[in-house]
A protein has these predicted regions:
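Structural motif
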Residues: 61-66, 115-122, 159-165, 222-228, ...
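Asp-box/WD-like beta-propeller blade repeats and closely related beta-sheet repeat scaffolds
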Residues: 116-164, 169-203
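Predominantly five- to eight-bladed beta-propeller fold
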Residues: 110-115, 119-122, 176-204, 212-276
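Beta-propeller domains
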Residues: 57-83, 113-114
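Blade-terminus and WD-like Trp-Asp/Gly-His loop motifs, strongest in beta-propeller folds
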Residues: 46-53, 59, 96-104, 145-153, ...
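Surface-exposed loop and turn segments in beta-propeller and other repeat-based domains
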Residues: 30, 34-35, 77-89, 174-196, ...
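Short loop/turn segments that connect beta-strands within beta-propeller blades
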Residues: 69-72, 127-131, 167-170, 268-272, ...
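N-terminal low-complexity segments that are often proline-rich with Ser/Thr-Pro
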Residues: 347-378
Length: 378
């Protein structure tokens, strides 16, 4: 009996003893635990290409290769850090975003995490044909960049402000907003509450013909601050906190405390006119998502009350900025899959479905029938 018990205990605890005793490259440490050594392996950075026959994938942080869906064999190389032209070089990339026309690639480097879904990084524009690199911006690290549908512009956020880079004008940079301030005003990027509760980061979008840009503005100036200590022994090491712990403060509203005041704004890229969209919203209401439809004059806006039991979908013209409600109804008071809304633009296989209807419409994911279903509204 004792032998059987010992055998069972050995089987149960031997993996734990092995893991706690030795990591892959030596004794178990804080660095090995937090550095990804024990993460599950997977396939990342796979992006289907326009030909429908192949896909691109980042390999070893240095190359973006093209492979065949049918055979899995490599058929080409889109980017090789060791084989570029010009003076600007990068030795390693953390990720990439292909332009819609696949002529350029945004290369992500020097990535730094902020919260669960947000990062800052230094991005470079890579010209596939010329094999040349150019920095997206010289003004500091960027957040949540987005290609325009025509592939000729890139929008991004830096320090709470929204910027636009025009590739056809020698990468000229336009600052759209100027009121961004840490722990006060954020343009085009979700605050902590929205990032955590609605699983969103980027809060701006281009319209289909790349003439307008819309974004959500978060005023968190009245949200209470939360502070937690920062120690030297954290990873990465904070030597400045060797003798006394430092502190990090950010806006964190507990139940009953004020949320950010949110509003929707548009920017006419040609005239540079900025407008506020007149969205009917409760004082403590949310705007979890905005997105342009395949019609460049229709901006979809999702709103929700703070109790999260009622949601509405509005459609607005980005220039007159008037809204009309096209869907209203009860919602689950929780977000089971955290995204529960699905705005579809003219891309991928959904483009064929929308074209087949020959009318304006959008897809909406909802639990209103007690089972998660996708609805098409027109």
């Amino acid at each position: 009996m004792i032998k059987k018990i010992l055998l069972v205990l050995t089987v149960l605890f031997s993996p734990l003893m092995s893991a706690t005793g030795m990591a892959e490259n030596g004794p178990l440490s804080l660095k090995s635990i937090t550095g990804g050594e024990f993460y599950a392996h997977g396939i990342y950075g796979v992006n289907p290409l326009a030909d429908g026959e192949s896909y691109s994938q980042l390999v070893d942080g240095k190359r973006i290769v093209v492979s065949s869906f049918k055979t899995g064999e490599q058929t080409g190389v889109l980017f090789d850090a060791d084989n570029t032209k010009g003076k600007v070089k990068v030795s390693r990339i953390d990720g990439y975003i292909m332009s819609p026309n696949q002529k350029n690639i945004l290369l992500r480097t020097q990535t730094q995490s902020i919260y669960r879904h947000s990062t800052t990084a230094v991005y470079y524009i890579y010209n596939v044909q010329n094999r040349t690199l150019a920095p997206l911006s010289d003004g500091g690290p960027q957040e949540c960049p987005l290609w325009s549908p025509d592939g000729n512009m890139v929008g991004f956020v830096r320090e709470g402000n929204l910027f636009l880079v025009k590739l056809l004008f020698d990468n000229a940079e336009v600052q759209i907003t100027k009121d961004g301030k840490f722990n006060s005003i954020i343009n085009g990027k979700a605050d902590w509450v929205y990032e955590e509760e609605f699983v969103t980061n980027r809060s701006f979008d281009f319209n289909a013909d790349a003439t307008m840009l819309a974004w959500i503005r978060y005023d968190e100036s009245q949200v209470p601050l939360f502070s937690f200590p920062m120690y030297k022994g954290m990873l990465p090491e904070m030597k400045e906190n060797a003798e006394y712990p430092g502190a990090y403060e950010y806006k964190y509203p507990i139940a009953g405390q004020p949320n950010s005041k949110v509003s929707v704004h548009t920017f006419d890229i040609k005239s540079r006119a900025t407008r506020e969209v007149k969205v009917p919203l409760e004082a403590e209401g949310y705007i979890p998502r905005i997105a342009f439809s395949s019609d460049p004059d229709k901006l979809l806006i999702l709103t929700q009350n703070r109790h999260q039991d009622n949601l509405q979908v509005w459609v607005a013209n980005p220039r007159p900025t008037e809204c009309r409600c096209i869907v209203t109804g009860e919602a689950q008071p929780y977000l089971a899959d955290k995204t529960y809304t699905l705005f579809i633009k003219s891309e991928g296989h959904f483009k064929i479905i929308i074209t087949a209807f020959k009318t304006f419409g959008y897809f909406f994911k909802s639990y209103k029938s007690s089972i998660k279903s996708i609805y098409f509204h027109m």
